[in-house]
Amino acid sequence: MLTAQLSRPSKSNTACRRGLIAACAMLTIAASTDTVLASSHREAPFITTVPKVDATDFYMFMSYETGRTDYVTLIANYLPLQAPYGGPNYFSLDPNALYEIHIDNNGDGKEELTFQFRFKNTLKSTALTIGDKSVPIPLIQSGVVNDPRAATLNLNETYTLDVVRGDRRSGTRASVTNATTGTATFDKPVDNIGRKTIADYPAYAAKHIYPINIPGCNLPGKVFVGQRKDPFAVNLGTIFDLVNAPVAVIADPALINAAPNTIDDKNVTTLALEIHKSCLVAGSETVIGGWTSASLRQARLVDPLPKSGHQTADKAGGAWVQVSRLGMPLVNEVVIGLPDKDKFNASKPKDDGQFLNYVTNPTLPALLSVVLNLPGAAPTNLPRNDLVTTFLTGIKGVNQPANVVPAEELRLNTAIAAVPFAQQNRLGIVGNILAKGNDNAGFPNGRRPKDDVVDVSLVAVMGGLCIANGDGNALGFGAACKPSAVPLGQTSLRLHDAVDQAVVPLLPNFPYLANPLGGTR
């Protein structure tokens, strides 16, 4: 059951004018097909040109691994749609980029903590003697790989991790270190090239899960950076072909897994942290907001005559410029209009009021009405304060900070205990409300890998919560959020994309996402 009476924030119209509603973004439909490929894969024009810094998904949840009570897991995925056979270079991250995970622990839309990842690729230039010549090999490996920094690796990828307190650029910075060795450099496993190169990839990857000491935190955490199977599930082809599916299918709960997951054969690169909640919260406030971003140097010079070596074809310099941003899933994907997608990726949560028109008057319900030939199916309770409450400020009594400033962040109440995987409702809080259950630990209270954010968002954006709210504002989503404002009626509670997130393979422990698919299987 909900832990408190749900109610929308006071002055919610003003709140709408100050922030971006993330959740109305999550309807998986779009009029343009050239920039969308999953939760946030290739979602903006510029980011399609720099896939190494393209954030695809962000997760933040209370760890449900046995023995990890009170720990928070943060996962940022980058570099989308990796083919398992994508050699010979595979998918290293960009040494000229800055990858960050931000935490807002007082609800002001600004980061108070930032975890910064920087990568370095070191080429060995392994060579073979051919006749009387020493000739470098064309591969990143020369034989079997079993351990970090194996002698057979021709390219070693390492990273450093810093924690910044305060502003991400001007705050106090300190190095996160390996709790076992005391070193500040970590090894990233090579991608899953195939079974002949790496016979037991799960065992090899597990050697790259490191215990860490975080300055200012009294309890050790964990870090893992490496390739994983893409955990997102969606029926892309059908959806972006103007939702080429009968309403009878996407409104039938018996058919929630009737369509193929079109990215089931793809990998991503994961940046994962597990940190005790006491190191993330501030004072008595138990709700934290989180998001990930990636930045590039402002200037890039391409060398017409690159020297021998690794990645010598360009030079980068100048200030960091943010080019990717992701908190709530699907926001830039399908809510922000095409002219503002690059602008959104460069923005910060505290400035989200500039995207007002995409929030209070969302286009997606109207688009769905058109492509499904259901005239007038969009909810009529404009402005959509039910969505503002649920996804922008957080739900009062669940994941709304006491002094919240509306902003597009994933919000998590660290005081709500994790629910074991088998008992998790795949529809998160929305499913919990509809089922009158006791799982308040799921999306949009954070996001777990099992949470079906596509289906949750379809229900919410098409008015399902207003059906549940009733004429008496039972759940506190606002008096205008009532059944008569929902043309689809009870059908809005049953919408889905015909791909079940709950059947995606996952691990029961950190880093939770499944091992990547190999180049040979």
Q: What are these regions, as identified by a protein language model?
A:
Residues 36-521:
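Surface-exposed extracytoplasmic segments
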Residues 27-36:
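C-terminal segment of classical bacterial N-terminal signal peptides
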Residues 1-16:
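N-terminal secretory signal peptides that target proteins for export/translocation
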Residues 13-27:
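Sec-dependent N-terminal signal peptides
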